[in-house]
Amino acid sequence: MESFSSKSLALQAEKKLLSKMAGRSVAHLFIDETSSEVLDELYRVSKEYTHSRPQAQRVIKDLIKVAVKVAVLHRNGSFGPSELALATRFRQKLRQGAMTALSFGEVDFTFEAAVLAGLLIECRDVLLELVEHHLTPKSHGRIRHVFDHFSDPGLLTALYGPDFTQHLGKICDGLRKMLDEGKL
């Protein structure tokens, strides 16, 4: 017997459509101004660190696609009780990572790449577990790409180094605002 669900089909179509349109206009439906500013700074950091505009664009585009898809899944009530617990755990880990990043940015000589990288890897693993049955292997690859990129100890060390002070300041300002507003 074939099981058919129009809700499932509609959700699949919505995710497919949004993945094709993961540009700025669709992102504004799910990503506010502060988040957009942080993403712009992360793009600049990635571009300067990798010396590759296409690579920086790809990682931010993957991040936006994943964020939009997870938002659609959450908005449509696709997560069961155990998955909602995972979503809460992911949010807590992300919040912990943001507070750690802020602390490292505000207190001189406290930065440890391994600590921040470890938190990002934990976030990646929880998110992968959360979306395991909802997103395709291609989307799982996007999640790995984004978190592996930003948890690179070399990138993190550069971000907290003297050449990226301006970018780090703007990222910290955005993270602080998002934490204050309860968006992280």
UniProtKB/Swiss-Prot annotation:
Record carries keyword Glycoprotein: no
Post-translational modification as stated in the protein's UniProt record: Phosphorylated by TAK1/MAP3K7; this phosphorylation triggers association with BTRC and subsequent ubiquitination and degradation.
Biological process per Gene Ontology, one example term: T cell activation
Domain of life according to the entry: Eukaryota
Keyword line: Cytoplasm, Immunity, Innate immunity, Lysosome, Nucleus, Phosphoprotein, Ubl conjugation
GO cellular component annotations of the record: lysosome; nucleus
InterPro entries: TNFAIP8-like (IPR008477), TNFAIP8_sf (IPR038355)
TM spans (from-to): none
PTM sites of type Phosphoserine: S3
Gene3D superfamilies: Tumor necrosis factor alpha-induced protein 8-like (1.20.1440.160)
Keyword RNA-binding: no
Compartments (UniProt record): Cytoplasm; Nucleus; Lysosome
Record note on quaternary structure: May interact with CASP8; however, such result is unclear since could not reproduce the interaction with CASP8. Interacts with RAC1.
Membership in a protein family: Belongs to the TNFAIP8 family. TNFAIP8L2 subfamily.
Task performed by this protein: Acts as a negative regulator of innate and adaptive immunity by maintaining immune homeostasis. Plays a regulatory role in the Toll-like signaling pathway by determining the strength of LPS-induced signaling and gene expression. Inhibits TCR-mediated T-cell activation and negatively regulate T-cell function to prevent hyperresponsiveness. Also inhibits autolysosome formation via negatively modulating MTOR activation by interacting with RAC1 and promoting the disassociation of the RAC1-MTOR complex.
PANTHER family: TUMOR NECROSIS FACTOR ALPHA-INDUCED PROTEIN 8-LIKE PROTEIN 2, TUMOR NECROSIS FACTOR INDUCED PROTEIN
Comment, domains: The central region was initially thought to constitute a DED (death effector) domain. However, 3D-structure data reveal a previously uncharacterized fold that is different from the predicted fold of a DED (death effector) domain. It consists of a large, hydrophobic central cavity that is poised for cofactor binding.
The name this protein goes by in its record: Tumor necrosis factor alpha-induced protein 8-like protein 2
Encoding gene (name): TNFAIP8L2
